A protein has these predicted regions:
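N-terminal Rossmann-like NAD(P) cofactor-binding module of classical short-chain dehydrogenase/reductase
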Residues: 4, 62, 107, 130-131
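Glycine-rich phosphate/adenylate-binding loop and adjacent beta-alpha elements
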Residues: 1-28, 32, 39
């Protein structure tokens, strides 16, 4: 039978030794290359939105880096969960891609102020859940515009910089900053 597994470092190899709890059967016709990418992006995102972010139907989800691998997964999983999805990316072309896979709204953070645009799109409320695989200089303005009791999911640092957030914002917003490390979660809680 064709199977795939999350194997951590070396997990994209053609052969690997992994815990049986991390192995899953592949549907017929599902290519191994696709399976390797699928497991990493969609499992990370499902864990982030369901387990860590507790995204609920009717809530607003802001996805940063929305045209990337985990970003596109977040748009699709967010829609399946019943969220209103706002996709933030660095170009209009990437925004069009995000709309084509289900995003309700888009923000081009290269040409507009993401904080102002998010407030505009949410009637001043902000996003209930922020999915952030980007980090860098977007983190603080986005966190400043998060909804009351919002959940800010730290998924990665694609921009390179690890942001420093003023923790008084978490207090003032009643918000949570939640780390997402699916690989470690899968290892510890298979």
């Amino acid at each position: 039978d064709a199977v795939a597994a999350f194997g951590g470092t070396g997990g994209f190899a053609t052969h690997a030794v992994v815990d049986a709890a991390l192995v899953m059967p592949l549907p017929m016709g599902f290519a191994f290359d696709d399976a390797a990418a699928f497991i990493l992006t969609y499992a990370t995102t499902h864990h982030a939105l369901v387990d860590r972010g507790q995204l609920k139907s009717g809530e607003t989800l802001l996805v940063l880096g929305a045209a990337g691998g985990v970003g596109t997964a977040a748009i699709q999983i967010g829609k399946v969960l019943g969220a209103r999805v706002i996709a933030a990316s660095s170009s209009d072309e990437k925004g069009e891609l995000c709309r084509s896979i289900g995003a309700d709204e888009t923000i081009n953070y290269a040409t507009s102020n993401i904080r102002d645009r998010l407030k505009e799109l949410t009637g001043g409320k902000g996003a209930d859940v922020v999915y952030d695989p980007v980090g860098g200089d977007l983190a603080e303005p986005v966190f400043r515009s998060i909804a009351w009791r919002g959940r800010y999911l730290v998924v990665g640092f694609a921009q390179g910089g690890i942001p420093a957030l003023p923790l008084n914002l978490a207090l003032l917003k009643g918000a949570s900053i939640v780390g997402v490390f699916w690989g470690e979660f899968a290892r510890r809680e298979p």
